[in-house]
Amino acid sequence: MKFTLSWLKDHLETDASLDEICDKLTAIGLEVGHVDDRSSLKGFVIAKVLKAMKHPDADKLQILLVDTGSGTPVQVICGAPNARVGLVGVLALPGTYVPGLDVTLSVGKIRGVESFGMMCSQAELELSNEHDGIIELPEDAPIGGLFATYAGLDDPVIDLSLTPNRSDCTGVHGIARDLAAAGIGRLRKLSLPKFVSSFETPLRVFLDFSQDASLCLGFAWREVRNIQNGVSPQWMQQRLSAIGLRPMNALVDMSNYISFDVGRPLHVFDADKIKGDLRVRRGREGEQLQALNGKIYNLSVKDCVIADEEGVVSIAGIMGGERTSCDEMTRRVIIESALWDARSIAQTGRALGLVSDARYRFERGVDPAFMETGLEVATELVLRLCGGEGSKTKIVGYQQPEIKQIAFPFSEIKRLTHLEIEREQVITILTNLGFGIEGEGNVVTVKVPTWRPDIAGKADLVEEVMRIYGLDKIEPIPLEGFAEAKGQVLTCTQIRSRVTRLALVDRGMREAVTWSFISESQAIAFGGGQAQLKLVNPIAADMSVMRPSLLPGLLIAAQRNADRGFPDLALFEVSNIYEDDTPEKQQSVAGGIRRGTERFEGAGRFWDGHTRTVDVFEAKADALAVLEACGLDIDKVQIEVGAPDWYHPGRSGVMKLGSKIIVGFFGVLHPAILERLDVSGPLCGFEIFLDRIPESKKKATKSRSPLKLSPFQMVRRDFAFVVDKVITSSLIVRAASGADKKLIHSVRVFDVFEDLSLGEDKKSVAIEVAIQPIERTLTDGDIEALASKVVENVTKATGAYLRR
């Protein structure tokens, strides 16, 4: 929100300096983003060229004698092609700082001829990039006068960074109101004209809505005829130019000016270009509008528009159309002042990519009680600038806004701020801000002004009082000290999340944080997409459903890195997934993926040439590392087939505890899933459900039991079993381990062999059993007895026989 200092003083009677005003604005919550005081232009004067002579030693230079109003001509050397006798321009005298050159002028010689100043271009004054010639001013410009004053460039421009809730400060009058309440001057009341009109406009306006009446809560219009649309006055042009708007003509400039002056967006139609009646309605598929910015916009049924019998003439509340725009030939206009739905304006603006000052104000909310008054202000300004006569005002669809009332106990200020503020001071602050106060005692009724839609409750009123009283007066209060917590502070899930992160980082993986919402197609591919998990207002079309798995986000992140030259990587995330919208179905999960050659041992090419890509075993090892870090005995984990469809059916597994508890999945990602997500492999991944891991029954302790190592040598024996192909290796390992849990240290598969010589649908699985004596060295008989027990257990569990 930009405005000039003189503009502010039209609404605020004050002697405060620019610095005092800016400091107070920031203090009351209206942050000053930038101030352009343009003090660097104060030393430039208006001068007229009296004489122009060719430089004796330079073909492209001239010796100018210029009149500065002092009575004594000044000699200046100039190389501008447009320098000539009679030209009125801008002169910088010695001692003047030239911002475009970043130099301070002094008397100097150019090719042997002294120069006592410099005729300036727009680029040298940083007014534009134009540097081909010096500035040319009208002949009636005051010779010797200050250029900054003449051009209106001595008026500081203040730029506020408004928060979205302060719609009341999108006009200079609202800003002045806040400053007056804060003690910076006195608020000047708006001059609200009233007209006695002699005729009625024949134009009719219809609100063509069925159940969408909230799209337009009121539409007021008035016709003004017999006007002359010329240029706007210089003071208005200077103010509009200062805030970055290009002056066009009196009618356009008037509507822009009122939008910034009192925060009331308007639109002016050329009445002779309107065909028939106006209708406010939804857009229609295939409709287009060439807007005032020259661009053509394709409209839809989601857009609110104003249309006549020939089609759309305006995108409601955002921008008008070229067909009904006003020009120098306009003689009859319709001034429109309406109330548009903030949400509809915001949605249409985003969909069309159309930004305007009107949209900026309507999507934040304008004062509903100022709709007709704003029309009166606009009419008065049109009559003053363009002449003519106005019709009676017509209004459709408007109802007086209901005044919001809040029961406000003065004790609420002490409760929220720990400050004691006098009752009368609180009432004065709220009254100066436009609030109405009724009642006596410690609880009063506060009537919220219609221009403050952001005030909803008692806390908002406390905030209003405090930002005017002074937020800096709130003394810091140290946090209350608490005794040291006894017992476990972190929850089980928090502890598991922490140790999981450490374990996966130790395995060379990098943590990622991805969005909790993904596209509907991705969610369906990973078993989700339920209706109750769809977002009502997604931030993007491809982020519309809560994720059922961590893998989609990690896969997209991996592909994004691969596209940027990092194909080998390992990512993990510890976060939540969602099965439905109940708290019980929000699960804490650790998920990870590896891509390319990013194995635990490293990535990329090796000197021996044996570069291997990631496979199911990397994913399995990562998953087991998580389970082990969470305190689970991984020897109890059963690995079976039957992973979800997004895994490769022959290169994946399910991790179970017993027959029912599934604690995770791992494997190579299915090629069809990768193609569906437009992701390239090789890729493997895992998912561990942290909430499903049983809590350890061991009592937590900071001390560790001493390491006990056996002094006896470990014995290893190999066994090769012939089993059916459907038998998993994990079943054989568990059966062998159960032969003697005290002596058997580990069981490991080291070979799988398939051949017709073994029989149809048969395979050979070779295991190594490590036997660790504890109390004494085992005899051959002990070892043979244990070996027989191993064979017996495996045969009983799987139907295998020992391969000879």
Swiss-Prot record:
Residues the entry annotates as binding Mg(2+): 454, 460, 463-464
GO cellular component, one term: phenylalanine-tRNA ligase complex
Compartments, as annotated in UniProt: Cytoplasm
Key words, A-Z: Aminoacyl-tRNA synthetase, ATP-binding, Cytoplasm, Ligase, Magnesium, Metal-binding, Nucleotide-binding, Protein biosynthesis, RNA-binding, tRNA-binding
A molecular-function term among this protein's GO annotations: phenylalanine-tRNA ligase activity
EC number: 6.1.1.20
Reactions catalysed: tRNA(Phe) + L-phenylalanine + ATP = L-phenylalanyl-tRNA(Phe) + AMP + diphosphate + H(+)
Record text on cofactor binding: Binds 2 magnesium ions per tetramer.
tRNA-binding domain location: 38-148
Pfam families xref list: B3_4, B5, FDX-ACB, tRNA_bind, tRNA_synthFbeta
Catalytic class of the enzyme: ligase
GO annotation, biological process: phenylalanyl-tRNA aminoacylation
Domain FDX-ACB residue range list: 710-803
Annotated HAMAP family: Phe_tRNA_synth_beta1
Family as reported in the entry's similarity comment: Belongs to the phenylalanyl-tRNA synthetase beta subunit family. Type 1 subfamily.
Name of the protein in its database record: Phenylalanine--tRNA ligase beta subunit
Species: Bartonella quintana (strain Toulouse)
Lineage, broadest ranks: Bacteria, Pseudomonadati, Pseudomonadota, Alphaproteobacteria, Hyphomicrobiales
Gene: pheT
